[in-house]
Amino acid sequence: MINSQNTLYLQTKPYWDYLRIEKQASQHTLSNYQRQLLAVSDMLSQAGISTWQEVNSATVRWIIAQSNKQGLGAKSIALRLVALRQWFSYLIRQEKMSVNPAVGIKAPKASKRLPKNIDAEQIGQLLTSDSHEPSDLRDLAMMELMYSSGLRLSELQGLDLGDMDLAGREVRLLGKGNKERIVPIGSKALEALNRWLAVRNQFKPQDNAVFLNKRGGRLSHRSIQLVMQKWGEKQGLESHLHPHKLRHSFATHMLEASGDLRAVQELLGHSNLATTQIYTHLDFQHLAKIYDAAHPRAKRKKQDDD
């Protein structure tokens, strides 16, 4: 059990007042830093270190190694390192240290997880609905649009009526970094949107948001996440449904069908092609079968190669 009364952690008390009052740090930042420095203080105390001035770059590397051994993820270790850097910077400003031992030390890189996607059969199961309830028409339209056009959750949530050109079958999106892009709307999504917009006024709109809550206001990010989760459960989807999964499925299916990485990059609004390239690793068996069938020198012999 971590001891919050250890000498090292007690030395950090003025730092929290400094962050709260002078730096106006959020409670979220304070809680994160406090949790990290408490854990490090305990680790160092058990190693016989009683002052922060005893910590050098070798000690910081040891902290990272110990954190890794304890099963801490790469992102958590990176946060721990940031908390240490900021704490040592404070001690330098207070003239209690002359060198920041955490500067120049890198946290381990997080392994890139392949996005999970829903296969075409499951998409059909998910997006099949005979309900005429206004809220169901809204929910189906959201999911059809996200899968049809690869929207981010923030893009879907921020969508206004003026952003859509239904006659031209396209939608204008404001993505990360306020970058604007225009993407096409598929026929199924267009049908679902028209059905929803026909009943949208029943929600007594308070603004121009495309997707409204029952009070007529814009649906929140969290509400959209909950709507999709419940819809997935209702439709019998085995895995947990969240907005990113629909975007990932759009990207995967588009890439499998077209093989055009640049086009998928444009549709997703990725500024860096490397971000899109993660989808090239998806469904390797599917791609390998295409390669075996198409490449003239890909015919594999049953016997072992020498």
UniProtKB/Swiss-Prot annotation:
One GO term of the biological process aspect: cell division
Domain Tyr recombinase positions: 113-292
Gene Ontology MF terms: DNA binding; tyrosine-based site-specific recombinase activity
Keywords, ordered alphabetically: Cell cycle, Cell division, Chromosome partition, Cytoplasm, DNA integration, DNA recombination, DNA-binding
Active site: 152, 176, 244, 247, 270, 279
SUPFAM superfamilies: DNA breaking-rejoining enzymes (SSF56349), lambda integrase-like, N-terminal domain (SSF47823)
PANTHER family, alphabetized: PHAGE INTEGRASE-RELATED, TYROSINE RECOMBINASE XERC
Annotated HAMAP family: Recomb_XerC_XerD
Functional note: Site-specific tyrosine recombinase, which acts by catalyzing the cutting and rejoining of the recombining DNA molecules. The XerC-XerD complex is essential to convert dimers of the bacterial chromosome into monomers to permit their segregation at cell division. It also contributes to the segregational stability of plasmids.
Subunit structure: Forms a cyclic heterotetrameric complex composed of two molecules of XerC and two molecules of XerD.
Similarity comment: family membership: Belongs to the 'phage' integrase family. XerC subfamily.
UniProt protein name: Tyrosine recombinase XerC
